[in-house]
Each structure stands twice: as C-alpha cells, then as structure tokens.
Amino acid sequence: MLPTLSPPQMCSLQQAICKGAATDAEKVTAIYNYIAGHYTYDAKLADEITSGKVSKYIPDTSATLNSSKGICYDLSSLFAAMCRSQSIPCSLTKGYAGRSYHAWNKVNVDGAWYQIDLTYAVTERVLNANSLYDCVSPLH
C-alpha cells in the first residue's frame, strides 16, 4: 500500500510547505527541509523493533505527521507521501545500511532519480537547500 496523507492534513500542510516553490526541485527541497527541521528520530521505537518487542512494523503516515517523530521507515514513508501529493515520483526503498535494516527514498527530479536519506537529515539536522543534492548522485 502506498503511503498517503488524509486530504485535510495533506492540503493544509502542502500549501504551507511548498508555498512559493515553482519547480519540482524546489518542492522536494522544501519537503526535505521541513521534515529535517521538524521531526526527530524515535530511538525508543527503533530499540523496541531491534529487540523484538515490536514486530511486523508498518509506518502510519498520519501518526508520524502528528507525533513529529519516527524511525527511518516512518520518515521515508512521510517523505514519499508528501512528494506524491505534489505529483513528484518518489519511492520508498528498504535494505541494509551496514548491518542495520534501513529505509530511504528515491525521488525523481527533472528526469533524474536521486537517493535521499531523511534519517540522516533528521539525526544530523542537515538543513541546507543548496547542498540537498550535493550528498547524493543521480541513479543511472
């Protein structure tokens, strides 16, 4: 199932986040900066999943939106939903980062696919629109 936001949440938030953004690159940057600046990593939930206290975890985009925190899967799901609500192609990718299971995004901007890791952005507070794509290279 593709992550989505409920219409009232999506409409009001997207209007505020993407206000003044004319291009897909500007919209992606606005969404990225919004999540990186307003959300925190939920280390407690990550520990519960890693320890097995929580199994079969599925992100709830509305819950993430309301709590302003999440693990990699939540943040990636939220980013994908926000991009898709702006008609920007975006996928959620799951795999491994080192030995840890991880989730991140691939987003299409101007015909090129880029990998974006919101977990890194949230934990390191990477907020620089000019360097958003400096740390990722287009996928070929």
What are the functions of these language-model segments?
Residues 27-31, 68-83:
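Active-site nucleophilic cysteine motif
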Residues 4-66, 137:
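Secondary-structure boundary elements
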